[in-house]
A protein has these predicted regions:
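N-terminal signal peptide c-region/cleavage motif recognized by signal peptidases
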Residues: 16-20
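Extracytosolic ligand-binding ectodomains
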Residues: 2-11, 21-364
Length: 364
């Protein structure tokens, strides 16, 4: 993998496959540009460090796929090297030849980049936050989505996990809770769960007769963690009961000491399974390269690059038209891309349990 320095931009990396024996199915060479806020021209803050980790993970994924026949030219631009960096980047003669443009991060920079992609036929990738495109014609992939989309995805996944169960939707009747409850109910109906019932949380214990005798799934639209113990107590009283947590209940830094919650499932965007030997090898390789622990952005960069590059290799530059209806489990993210009115959105979510003091990936 050759490297050359660009005078006006951050760096440009050419990733060119060398194994002729692997090149037959993937004869095309693809071009990807990372346009991210590295802050290479001044103060190196936490965001710049995060972007360097993302870039390193992205590049490591490209290198791994190079052995399988990937031919890639990877360009890297600093969108915040100075006040005019993005404009300078958008006028770079090579940028119009890109198949994918990953970034920038902020909406004010995404808007002109969206116009550029529409003009030149590139797919725009929003890697770290949701960006609503100005045009429905924009080819865009949002790897992170609004909470409303995540709520709908959780309801659909619960229906797929437990098709024969009785579903209850817990609400405290707050405005946001009722909004999420309506989303869940619509999604369950789409997934052929037609008789879900509403469970009102008032702060008091839930009576024994409030839930069916067996095979119960409770979805919480209540953000307050005070509801967790009450709902979990009710679910634990059932032989086959499951509680899907609200998306705000899990915090990656919270202690799991003396916790055992096998009937509680936490939705979480970012989770690295400590038992994943491939993730352990990635961590070791990253540390050998950078002499530092990989942050979550390194894992995110690897997962996104692997998915995008593998899609290019499999389906070509129009892969966005041939997205598989399946989960891809990376080192930290689950990716499941699906078309919507706001472009392509990632509906993939990790599902965790805390069992005997340890976080574990939930596998039904």
């Amino acid at each position: 993998m050759g490297i050359k320095i660009l005078r006006y931009f951050f760096i440009c990396i050419g990733c060119i496959a060398t194994g002729a024996a692997h090149a037959q199915p993937f004869a095309n060479e693809y071009r990807i540009a990372l346009v991210l806020p590295f802050h290479s021209g001044g103060y190196h803050g936490s965001l710049g460090e995060a972007m360097l980790d993302y870039y390193t993970g992205f590049r490591m994924a490209a290198e791994d796929l190079e052995a399988d026949g990937l031919k890639l030219q990877l360009y890297v631009f600093d969108s915040e090297k100075d006040s005019n960096a993005l404009n300078t980047t958008l006028y770079h003669p090579d940028l119009k030849t890109m198949n994918l443009i990953v970034g920038p991060v902020y909406d004010k920079e995404m808007a002109p980049t969206e116009k550029f992609c529409n003009l030149n036929g590139s797919v725009l990738i929003s890697p770290l936050k949701f960006y609503k495109p100005a045009s429905e014609e924009t080819k865009i992939i949002n790897f992170y989505v609004p909470d409303s989309v995540r709520i709908a995805s959780i309801a659909c996944k619960a229906a797929n996990f437990y098709p024969g169960y009785k579903f209850y939707l817990a609400t405290d009747n707050s405005t946001k809770s009722k909004e999420y409850l309506a989303i869940m109910k619509r999604q369950l109906t789409k997934c052929k769960i037609k008789n879900s019932k509403t469970l009102i949380y008032t702060g008091a214990a839930i009576g024994a007769n409030a839930l069916a005798k067996d095979s119960v799934v409770v979805l919480s639209s209540i953000s307050s963690t005070s509801a967790k113990d009450v709902l979990l107590t009710a679910v634990n009283a059932k032989k086959n009961g499951i509680l899907f947590a609200h998306i705000d209940w899990h915090n990656a830094s919270m202690s799991t000491f003396e916790k055992d919650e096998p009937k509680l499932i936490y939705p979480e965007s970012n989770f690295t399974n400590p038992a994943d030997s491939a993730a352990v090898r990635f961590r070791t390789a990253f540390m050998n390269r950078t002499y530092a622990e990989p942050s979550k952005y390194a894992y995110i960069g690897y997962d996104q690059a692997y998915y995008l590059c593998l899609s290019l290799m499999t389906f070509g530059k129009d892969f966005i038209l041939h997205l598989p209806d399946a989960d891809y489990r990376g080192f930290i993210n689950t990716i499941h891309l699906q078309n919507s009115k706001c472009g392509v959105q990632n509906l993939g979510i990790n599902y965790l349990q805390i069992v005997e003091d340890e976080r574990r990936e939930f596998k039904p």
